[in-house]
């Protein structure tokens, strides 16, 4: 898209007259030098004509040799103030002027299009126009701030609405282990000659594992009541003490007879 600004030639208020006067003076001196070659060269006007013609020819040859394409542009854009320097803005407002036209040209684009950007000036190489160190290209290097869309961020309180699972108590898996250890310890203390009442006593330990539920801890309680762990241990200790007392009495009875 273009920008609705006037021709930037008006911004070089003194550039156009200076360039026109310089070219007309050089051309007049050149013509005077060629036309007055038969006159006395040692006179003041003759010396000025020779110097002016030499400067004009040097200027012309230098630009024809060094900046061929740029010289064509300078000749074409002579009367429109497009000379020596090149300025380009993002709104495609361009101008070629002498004495810092980029600041004026880009400022016109800047004010017209209301682009709140930063303008950077620097020497650049324009393809097809030779390596001209005097060409200054100014361009928009920072885009205007774009209003970001409002994104709804949920407050942290909503994230904490997730159900919190309370820690479950540990399952009583450690109870059968001491029972197994005690069952292993019983054969060690028992003598080889068992009394006739031992089968009735040994029938209690296998009945205890059947009372323990085999399901998870949150399952429904069984129909038969369970004995607390302390009561079961006390019963086992009493049974063992009774068995030991019976064995001692039997041994004393045997030794007495």
Swiss-Prot record:
> Ranges of Basic residues compositional bias?
179-193
> Where are its TM segments located?
14-34, 45-65
Give Gene Ontology CC terms.
host cell Golgi membrane; membrane
Top-level taxonomic group? Viruses
Composition bias type Pro residues, residue spans: 164-175, 214-228
Tell me which UniProt keywords the record has, alphabetically: Host Golgi apparatus, Host membrane, Membrane, Transmembrane, Transmembrane helix
Query: According to its UniProt record, where is this protein mainly located?
Result: host cell
User: Subcellular localization, per the record?
Assistant: Host Golgi apparatus membrane
Membrane association type: Multi-pass membrane protein
Outline the segment boundaries, as ranges, of region: Disordered: 149-232
Protein name from the UniProt record = Protein UL133
Organism in which the protein naturally occurs: Human cytomegalovirus (strain Merlin)
């Amino acid at each position: 898209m273009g920008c609705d600004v006037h021709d930037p030639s008006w911004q070089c208020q003194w550039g156009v007259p200076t360039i026109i006067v310089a070219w007309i003076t050089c051309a007049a001196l050149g013509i005077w030098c060629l036309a007055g070659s038969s006159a006395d060269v040692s006179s003041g006007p003759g010396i000025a004509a020779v110097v002016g013609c030499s400067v004009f020819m040097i200027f012309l040859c230098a630009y024809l040799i060094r900046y061929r394409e740029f010289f064509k542009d300078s000749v074409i854009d002579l009367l429109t103030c497009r000379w020596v320097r090149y300025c380009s803005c993002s709104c495609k407002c361009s101008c070629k002027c002498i004495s810092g036209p980029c600041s004026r040209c880009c400022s016109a684009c800047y004010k017209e299009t209301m682009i709140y950007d930063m303008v950077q000036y620097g020497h650049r190489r324009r393809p097809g126009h030779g390596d001209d160190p005097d060409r200054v290209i100014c361009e928009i290097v920072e885009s205007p701030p774009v209003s970001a869309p409002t994104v709804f961020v949920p407050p942290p309180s909503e994230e904490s609405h997730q159900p919190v699972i309370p820690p479950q108590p540990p399952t009583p898996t450690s109870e059968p282990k001491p029972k197994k250890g005690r069952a292993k310890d019983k054969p060690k203390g028992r003598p080889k000659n068992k009394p006739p009442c031992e089968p009735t006593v040994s029938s209690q330990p296998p009945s205890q594992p059947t009372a323990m539920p085999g399901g998870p801890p949150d399952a429904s309680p069984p129909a038969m009541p369970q004995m607390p762990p302390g009561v079961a241990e006390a019963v086992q200790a009493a049974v063992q003490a009774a068995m030991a007392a019976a064995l001692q009495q039997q041994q004393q009875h045997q030794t007495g007879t």
